[in-house]
Amino acid sequence: MTINNGTLQVPGANIHYQVRGSGPIILLVHGGGGDADKFHHVANHLANWYTVVTYDRRGHSRSNLANQIEGYRVETHSDDAHRLLAKITNKPAYVFGSSSGAVIGLDLCIRHPEQVHVMIPHEPILLQLLHGNELKQAEQFMEDLKKNHRSEVIKLMSRLETDEQSKAVLTKRLLGNSTYFTEYEIQGILSYTLDFEALKTVFTSSPMKILPAGGSASRELFPYRCANALAEQLETEWVEFPGNHTGYTMYHKEFSERLHDMLEKEKKHTC
């Protein structure tokens, strides 16, 4: 598999991105604590049908910030995605976003609907869609995640079977992503309010499609409920994928086939 690497300079950051495959463009937007490599295996499968674009969001791995203490804003990350798509293509693209990446994708839909053909927000972290005890539990989960994420990364790395030099490099990279996630992104994503009226307006007045999605193993968890509630708000189709919140890391082939089948079905509906 040939993977072409590139760098895009955007205001305040250099964005590292990767392109593989051929066919219609699909942009994959990772969640908190990850980077382009989170999608490595699923991107390789998708490259059988698509030109797959992955990237390290600003503040992650190879996408360096000009200001290391820059605050996190969904709108800034959305603008990065807009600029990256504009560099790659002048046509509407498929966009898949996971977790906080799904929120970034939805913000992109509001600001640049002309760039998005189909948006798949997979378990978006949108606590504004939750109420009562469900909301309280989600808030507590995010607080616990903020406290424990770094130690979980260290545990994960301790179980990794690779040489010590490679492990040291990867540990430094993932801990850097974890620091950005816990110190900036969690608060930023929780402070963000999605403009549902604006989203509904572009959803109903443009050819763009939004297909919220959740993992079949996540049904009892709040991100799944966020995706389900989003589908209810938009009165649109609801899609289920294999696995949990990060099912694409465990079920590469099944996940990519589900995504491809879904997009093929959508293409037939619009023909």
Swiss-Prot record:
One of its GO terms (biological process) is glycerolipid catabolic process. Its EC number is 3.-.-.-. Coiled coil: none annotated. Residues 24-124 form the AB hydrolase-1 domain. Pfam families: Abhydrolase_1 (PF00561). Keywords: Hydrolase. The keyword Protein biosynthesis does not apply. InterPro entries: AB_hydrolase (IPR050471), AB_hydrolase_1 (IPR000073), AB_hydrolase_fold (IPR029058). It is an enzyme of class 3 (hydrolase). GO terms for molecular function: triacylglycerol lipase activity. It comes from the Bacteria. Gene3D superfamilies: alpha/beta hydrolase (3.40.50.1820). Belongs to the AB hydrolase superfamily. This is Uncharacterized hydrolase YraK. It comes from Bacillus subtilis (strain 168).
